[in-house]
């Protein structure tokens, strides 16, 4: 297996106007705790944003996130780029709010990130409805903002299963207020278009649900959850390849075209945080498995308005990550180590790869990362991160 590595240095800058807040999305710079917004009789507009300029270096066959690909695989290369530039507008009035967020980068130009409304009932303060374009409610890392995430990028499995993290949809949110004994339990359940932020292109809708349980104590907090995804992918031809123990089984029937392959994921997540005399330690991880419809050359989920026009390949997958982070006491420094893995086809490995219709698309991918963050001031933090794959 080829070993690739890239060192990343970037600075995240934060600017907030017309309203007091610590960081985007209500996050403290080095915390993940969620706090309720106070109910106000007056409308409040908050504008926030951050930039992530990056310098990346990689070995010849590395895949960097900024700049053009390497034209000489025998030599290392480096690139400068603006990985992310988010500008967010959030307006809140009583128990309703609206959010619009755009992203500006050298790689994608200007794109829409979020555009949704959020309404909570004022009596029990427990039930809410969110509708528009927003993060899919699956696990922990998808919803963790880039401005506070310990690593520059999400685990490899998430952009494969959930490109762009967002989707069009409507979601029911159930979580009791903090003064209720039931606040330790939460539920998010919604119906989504299933193809990311591209135009909705069929009558089928996907279901995503996340049930979580967690609490906070003086020097310890925890959160655990389970997620489920039940969706569909359009079959563009009459040929469907289903992975078996001996390779892909091919079924060709003209009636298969226009039908829908099942897209089904299961996920489990947990996060533990400890505070000691040495600082704050975070241990977080997720495990996902299920069935992923794809093509011969990719196991990535659809994220465009165009319907697939190629054969459908059904693969059983699994993957996830484990992350350990530590904020060093009485210093502005944090350390992080992470292992993530994605096996797009659990029925093939080793010497069997390349037989039975399998190929590079079915190969297991893993990565180990180490990094350090310097929290110079609120809203400014250079990060150095090394990625080994």
What would you call each of these model-derived segments?
Residues 1-3, 185, 386:
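N-terminal start-of-domain structural block
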Residues 34-64, 72-196, 201-208, 212-219, ...:
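Outer membrane beta-barrel
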Residues 16-17, 96, 298:
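Hydrophobic alpha-helical membrane context
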Residues 26-27, 60, 73-74, 116-119, ...:
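Outer-membrane beta-barrel pore domains
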Residues 8-9, 46, 282:
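Hydrophobic alpha-helical segments
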């Amino acid at each position: 297996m080829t070993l690739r590595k890239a060192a990343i240095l970037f600075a995240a800058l934060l600017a907030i106007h017309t309203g007091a807040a610590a960081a985007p999305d209500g996050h403290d710079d080095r915390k993940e705790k969620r706090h309720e917004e106070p109910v106000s009789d007056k409308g409040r507009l908050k504008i926030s944003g951050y930039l992530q300029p990056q310098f990346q270096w990689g070995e010849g066959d590395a895949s960097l996130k900024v700049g053009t690909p390497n034209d000489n695989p025998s030599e290392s290369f480096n690139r400068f780029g603006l990985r992310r530039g988010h500008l967010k507008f959030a307006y809140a009035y009583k128990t309703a709010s609206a959010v619009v967020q755009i992203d500006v980068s050298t790689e994608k130009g200007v794109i829409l990130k979020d555009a949704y409304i959020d309404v909570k009932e004022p009596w029990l303060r427990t039930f809410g409805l969110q509708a528009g374009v927003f993060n899919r409610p699956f696990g922990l890392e998808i919803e963790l903002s880039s401005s506070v995430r310990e690593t520059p990028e999400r685990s490899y499995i998430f952009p494969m299963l959930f490109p762009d993290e967002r989707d069009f949809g409507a979601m029911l949110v159930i979580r009791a207020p903090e003064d209720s004994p039931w606040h330790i339990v939460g539920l998010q359940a919604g119906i989504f278009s299933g193809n990311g932020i591209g135009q909705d292109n069929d009558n089928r809708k996907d279901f995503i649900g996340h049930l979580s349980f967690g609490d906070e104590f003086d020097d310890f907090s925890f959160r655990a959850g389970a997620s489920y995804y039940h969706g569909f992918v359009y079959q563009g031809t009459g040929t469907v390849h289903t992975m078996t123990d001996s390779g892909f089984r091919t079924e060709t029937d003209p009636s298969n075209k226009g039908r829908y392959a099942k897209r089904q994921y299961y996920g489990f997540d947990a996060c533990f945080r400890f505070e000691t005399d040495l600082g704050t330690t975070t241990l977080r991880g997720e495990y996902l498995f299920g069935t992923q419809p794809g093509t011969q050359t990719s196991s990535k989920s659809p994220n465009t308005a165009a319907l697939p026009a190629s054969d459908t390949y059904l693969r059983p997958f699994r993957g996830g990550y484990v992350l350990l982070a530590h904020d060093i006491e009485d210093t502005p420094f944090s350390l992080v180590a992470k292992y993530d893995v994605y096996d797009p086809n659990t029925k093939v490995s080793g010497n069997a790869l390349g037989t039975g219709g399998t190929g590079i698309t079915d190969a297991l991918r893993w990565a180990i990362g180490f990094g350090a963050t310097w929290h110079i001031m609120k809203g400014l933090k250079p990060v150095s991160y090394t990625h080994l794959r």
